[in-house]
Amino acid sequence: MSQSNTLTVQILDKEYCINCPDDERANLESAARYLDGKMREIRSSGKVIGADRVAVMAALNITHDLLHRKERLDQESSSTRERVRELLDRVDRALANPADAGEA
């Protein structure tokens, strides 16, 4: 089992100490850098004032992107499953009727 250690990350000029298993350290550091970048991007636009509001906007933007990608992957997965079913049906028909295999 992984041992937990405290990791200090800096997000929008503030330090946060987070308890994190060793095997998740790199992922957490990467997530913190990503969040910091998104929050700085929003803050630099000048349209959102206050760290709390910047954090909420960053969370909404990241969540929107995540859900959009998940939806796209779900559609691609569904399309791939359908294509595999079609190919399996063709194989089954070809095996059932070897004389007709060249016509499909």
UniProtKB/Swiss-Prot annotation:
It is found in: Cytoplasm. One of its GO terms (cellular component) is cytosol. Residues 66-94 form a coiled coil. Its main location: cytoplasm. Keywords: Cell cycle, Cell division, Coiled coil, Cytoplasm, Septation. InterPro entries: Cell_div_ZapA-like (IPR007838), Cell_div_ZapA-like_sf (IPR036192), Cell_div_ZapA_N (IPR042233). Pfam families: ZapA. GO terms for biological process: division septum assembly; FtsZ-dependent cytokinesis; septin ring assembly. Signal peptide: none annotated. Belongs to the ZapA family. Type 1 subfamily. Activator of cell division through the inhibition of FtsZ GTPase activity, therefore promoting FtsZ assembly into bundles of protofilaments necessary for the formation of the division Z ring. It is recruited early at mid-cell but it is not essential for cell division. Homodimer. Interacts with FtsZ. This is Cell division protein ZapA. The gene is zapA.
